[in-house]
From Swiss-Prot:
<comment type="function">
    <text>Specifically methylates the N7 position of guanine in position 527 of 16S rRNA.</text>
</comment>
<feature type="binding site">
    <location>
        <position position="73"/>
    </location>
    <ligand>
        <name>S-adenosyl-L-methionine</name>
    </ligand>
</feature>
<dbReference type="Pfam" id="PF02527">
    <property type="entry name" value="GidB"/>
</dbReference>
<feature type="binding site">
    <location>
        <position position="138"/>
    </location>
    <ligand>
        <name>S-adenosyl-L-methionine</name>
    </ligand>
</feature>
<feature type="binding site">
    <location>
        <position position="78"/>
    </location>
    <ligand>
        <name>S-adenosyl-L-methionine</name>
    </ligand>
</feature>
<protein>
    <recommendedName>
        <fullName>Ribosomal RNA small subunit methyltransferase G</fullName>
        <ecNumber>2.1.1.170</ecNumber>
    </recommendedName>
</protein>
<dbReference type="GO" id="GO:0005829">
    <property type="term" value="C:cytosol"/>
</dbReference>
<keyword id="KW-0963">Cytoplasm</keyword>
<dbReference type="InterPro" id="IPR003682">
    <property type="entry name" value="rRNA_ssu_MeTfrase_G"/>
</dbReference>
<feature type="binding site">
    <location>
        <begin position="124"/>
        <end position="125"/>
    </location>
    <ligand>
        <name>S-adenosyl-L-methionine</name>
    </ligand>
</feature>
<comment type="similarity">
    <text>Belongs to the methyltransferase superfamily. RNA methyltransferase RsmG family.</text>
</comment>
<keyword id="KW-0949">S-adenosyl-L-methionine</keyword>
<keyword id="KW-0698">rRNA processing</keyword>
<keyword id="KW-0808">Transferase</keyword>
<dbReference type="InterPro" id="IPR029063">
    <property type="entry name" value="SAM-dependent_MTases_sf"/>
</dbReference>
<dbReference type="GO" id="GO:0070043">
    <property type="term" value="F:rRNA (guanine-N7-)-methyltransferase activity"/>
</dbReference>
<keyword id="KW-0489">Methyltransferase</keyword>
Length: 203
């Protein structure tokens, strides 16, 4: 698995330390192990997880601006855990409303000694503790849903980062909240079939 991760990182032009690579592989092993009982992801094969979960998250890293981020509807920690491993200088809050997912994330943080992540069990509409430089999500079906639930979470200069598949601009036209498109970035995820986009929005 280490060799495959090394190849994927080279293809994506991402540089990580050996320690960071070990943490990413450790995360995949834990996700695979816990998935059998907790049903955390539909992806069953660990090597497939490297592409569909790890690389799909890591390619966002270069586009993040700021120091504080919240991953809304993080599920088993995606994209938050890979991004936190790749960016130990940034702080991440991982928010989910399902207890089993937060329990899993807490175990990951303990076993892999990740210190820049705060897991929070909450529904997004009930979380008002603070604001962030960036609001991350790959969980929402539509940009309109994301903005309806998360509109108060970015600070004055903060941005929304939505991970999407195919993007043609029509989804943005359905958004009710006042918002501006900062960028629509086509992502290169090595060995992933299908399009991926990062939609960056600001109030």
């Amino acid at each position: 698995m280490k060799q495959k991760l090394d190849r994927l990182l080279v293809q994506a032009d991402i540089q990580l330390t050996e320690r960071q690579k070990e943490q990413l592989i450790g995360f995949v092993h834990l996700l695979h192990k816990w998935n059998k009982a907790y049903n955390l992801t539909s992806v069953r094969d660990p090597e497939e997880m490297l592409v569909k979960h790890i690389m799909d998250s890591l390619v966002v890293s270069v586009h993040l601006q700021g120091q504080s981020f919240i991953d809304v509807g993080t599920g088993p920690g995606l994209p938050g855990i890979p991004l936190a491993i790749a960016n130990p200088d940034k702080q991440f809050v991982l928010l989910d409303s399902l207890g089993k997912r937060i329990t899993f994330i807490k175990q990951v943080l303990r076993e892999l000694a990740i210190t820049n992540v705060t897991p929070v069990l909450s529904r997004v509409e009930q979380y008002t503790a603070r604001q962030f430089d960036g609001v991350l999500s790959r969980a929402f079906a539509s940009l309109d849903d994301m903005l309806n639930w998360c509109y108060a979470l970015p600070n004055d200069s903060g941005k929304f980062y939505a991970l999407k598949g195919v993007y043609d601009g029509t989804e943005l036209q359905a958004v009710q909240k006042p918002i501006k498109l900062v960028d629509a970035i086509k992502l290169n995820v090595p060995q992933l079939v299908g399009e991926r986009h990062l939609i960056v929005l600001a109030k």
